Amino acid sequence: MSNALVVAGDSLVPSNRVSQMHPVFKAFVCGSLSGTCSTLLFQPLDLVKTRIQAHQLSASAAGSRPRMLNLLIKVVRNENILGLWKGVSPSFLRCIPGVGLYFSTLYTLKHHFFSERDPKPLESVMLGAGSRTVAAVCMLPFTVVKTRYESGKYGYNSVYGALKAIYKTEGPRGLFSGLTATLMRDAPFSGIYLMFYTRAKKLAPHDQIDPLFSPVLNFSCGIVAGILASVATQPADVIKTHMQLANEKYHWTGKVALNIYRTQGLTGFFQGGVPRALRRTLMAAMAWTVYEQMMEKMGLKS
């Protein structure tokens, strides 16, 4: 039907308008909508991860390590159930356009350089890392605000107020604090994830299962890829969080890493690893599954 809507099987966008969209814009829309779903569902895990890592910055926290379940209970008790979604506004402002920008950049690069063949493993790493770098740099100010919102240490009243306060007190540098650590975390994660995800999908027996269960199989491939990528990039995530919570205390990534090692040892680089691995793995797996289903509905190869 000419006015039917084609997004993940539901009626959201008129099909005649969809067909007129540029493929890159279609990839952006699909990515943004998949990012919306995954961000809303898994925001509580990101909040818990940030609280665990913020706990490291407290002098009184020496020798004590909060458990994920205890933190969840504490947040619900002190801030009610909606407290688990604290920071969801900057998360949306970061993830919705950020995920869309990532997928549209990835689509552009992939179809420009690899239109006639699939990328090799190392090429997949470079594709994922390059696309994520573009998105991460553009969205970093919102990442800083999100991290501070979730930490519970800052009394910002709005995202705009937070951006204004950071710029006023710390300058442009404050809005891009943790840039190096963010790229060290996000670019490798996306590159490693894309490599393992595409390899896992090739090994998966797609021809032996009902097409109806294809999204489940893709989601399972995403889980495996996400776990491997999360473990590899966890230290960079801890460093990034420390830099974004410490105002002007740290300006050099190496200094932060050295301080974590001196005060926490090697285990300090893996604080918040479980909730982060859960969130990043589930978010990436869901985002890719939804994105690929939506792109298929639009008649495009992801």
From Swiss-Prot:
Solcar repeats lie at residues 22-112, 119-203, 213-297. It catalyses: glycine(in) = glycine(out). Keywords: Membrane, Mitochondrion, Mitochondrion inner membrane, Repeat, Transmembrane, Transmembrane helix, Transport. Its main location: mitochondrion. HAMAP family: SLC25A38 (MF_03064). Mitochondrial glycine transporter that imports glycine into the mitochondrial matrix. Plays an important role in providing glycine for the first enzymatic step in heme biosynthesis, the condensation of glycine with succinyl-CoA to produce 5-aminolevulinate (ALA) in the mitochondrial matrix. Required during erythropoiesis. May play a role as pro-apoptotic protein that induces caspase-dependent apoptosis. This is Mitochondrial glycine transporter. It comes from Xenopus laevis. The lineage of its organism: Eukaryota, Metazoa, Chordata, Craniata, Vertebrata.
